[in-house]
């Protein structure tokens, strides 16, 4: 039963690019993307605040679902659509403050135990990864593969889910076929020879998400 402690999100979030700059946020919104995440790593709040403010403003202008990775205090301060947290960030974050501010919450998971932890927090959506090997970040866990992803999606049947990790344009149809509601991509767009074409093709496969 999908009864999150945070505001709900659509069951299908569709194509969900994760990018590290306001420039990419603006490009992708202009290309028709409506779910996306600003993920800037390892900088102090004051160093990223201007980018967070600009990204949130763009998200509002395009009526998009913009999640801020990790910088939950800034997300609350500037009223982002939502926050995305890794497992390691859950303990150090004031979830009550995020809830009280009316922000949506997404949580990363890598196995059944982490799914249990995520479910206990009753977030707005649960991310499942990493599906395939990925060069974007060092991962302590092994890739899950499509079979494991499908099992997790079935377990979380009522929950909005996001698949992430090594999802290329070629692999995207098989990932969507598991029933997952969204695919998060990074290098499939940012390292594509033609990012506009890649984005259009991925939108064709994953959609823009439900309203």
UniProtKB/Swiss-Prot annotation:
2-[(2R,5Z)-2-carboxy-4-methylthiazol-5(2H)-ylidene]ethyl phosphate binds at residues 134-136, 166, 186-187. The keyword Metal-binding applies. One of its GO terms (molecular function) is thiamine-phosphate diphosphorylase activity. Pathway: Cofactor biosynthesis; thiamine diphosphate biosynthesis; thiamine phosphate from 4-amino-2-methyl-5-diphosphomethylpyrimidine and 4-methyl-5-(2-phosphoethyl)-thiazole: step 1/1. Its cofactor is Mg(2+). Mg(2+) binds at residues 70, 89. GO terms for biological process: thiamine biosynthetic process; thiamine diphosphate biosynthetic process. It is an enzyme of class 2 (transferase). It comes from the Bacteria. Keywords: Magnesium, Metal-binding, Thiamine biosynthesis, Transferase. Gene3D superfamilies: Aldolase class I. InterPro entries: Aldolase_TIM, ThiamineP_synth_sf, ThiamineP_synth_TenI, TMP_synthase. 4-amino-2-methyl-5-(diphosphooxymethyl)pyrimidine binds at residues 37-41, 69, 108, 137. GO terms for cellular component: cytoplasm. NCBIfam families: PRK03512.1, thiE. Condenses 4-methyl-5-(beta-hydroxyethyl)thiazole monophosphate (THZ-P) and 2-methyl-4-amino-5-hydroxymethyl pyrimidine pyrophosphate (HMP-PP) to form thiamine monophosphate (TMP). Belongs to the thiamine-phosphate synthase family. This is Thiamine-phosphate synthase. It comes from Shigella boydii serotype 4 (strain Sb227). The gene is thiE.
């Amino acid at each position: 039963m999908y009864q999150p402690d945070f505001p709900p999100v659509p069951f299908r979030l569709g194509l969900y690019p994760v990018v590290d700059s306001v420039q990419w946020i603006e490009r992708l919104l202009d290309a028709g993307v409506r779910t996306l995440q600003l993920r800037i790593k390892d900088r102090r709040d004051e160093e990223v605040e201007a980018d967070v403010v600009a990204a949130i403003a763009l998200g509002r202008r395009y009526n998009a679902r913009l999640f801020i990775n990790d910088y939950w205090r800034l997300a609350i301060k500037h009223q982002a659509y939502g926050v995305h947290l890794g497992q390691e960030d859950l303990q150090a974050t004031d979830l009550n403050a995020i809830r009280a501010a009316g922000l949506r919450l997404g949580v990363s998971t890598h196995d059944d135990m982490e799914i249990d932890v995520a479910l206990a927090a009753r977030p707005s959506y649960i991310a499942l990864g990493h599906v395939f090997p990925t060069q974007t970040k060092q991962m302590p866990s092994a890739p899950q593969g499509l079979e494991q992803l499908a099992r997790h999606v079935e377990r979380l049947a009522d929950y909005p889910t996001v698949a992430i990790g090594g999802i290329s344009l070629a692999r995207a149809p098989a990932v969507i076929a598991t029933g997952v509601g969204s695919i998060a991509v990074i290098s499939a767009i940012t390292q594509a020879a033609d990012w506009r074409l890649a984005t259009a093709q991925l939108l064709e496969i994953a959609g823009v998400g439900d309203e």
